[in-house]
Amino acid sequence: MKKIVVLSGAGISAESGIKTFRDSNGLWENHKIEDVASPEGFARNPELVLEFYNLRRRQLSEVNPNEAHYILAELQKDFDVHIITQNVDDLHERAGSENIIHLHGELKKVRPVNDEESIILWEDDLNLGDLDENGIQLRPHI
């Protein structure tokens, strides 16, 4: 079976209504990337980071995969397709794609602040006081 490797970015999900980071009026317009997308940013201001990603997670629940997502999933019938995405949404998965690597993490996953390996599926808002089984604060898997 022939292999196809796809590198996807913000453009594929923008078509579904996901706000991108670098557009005019984009998500980074009001925030420095290091303030909302780094462990150091979370340590400095966890409330900002949690609210930023809670808003993104809510937005994600209001959109659906678009034709491009479905076409890539459909290719799996005839090819060994691997998708490497810079996106943190789950639109590739919801369209039916299976072999996906998220370079920058995933909105619907969280992890303890002190553990890069333990990753937990998370659908709801994440708040201060949401802890793992060991009592460690959870943070977005971004």
Predicted regions and their residues:
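Conserved catalytic core of sirtuin-type NAD+-dependent deacylases
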Residues: 1-142
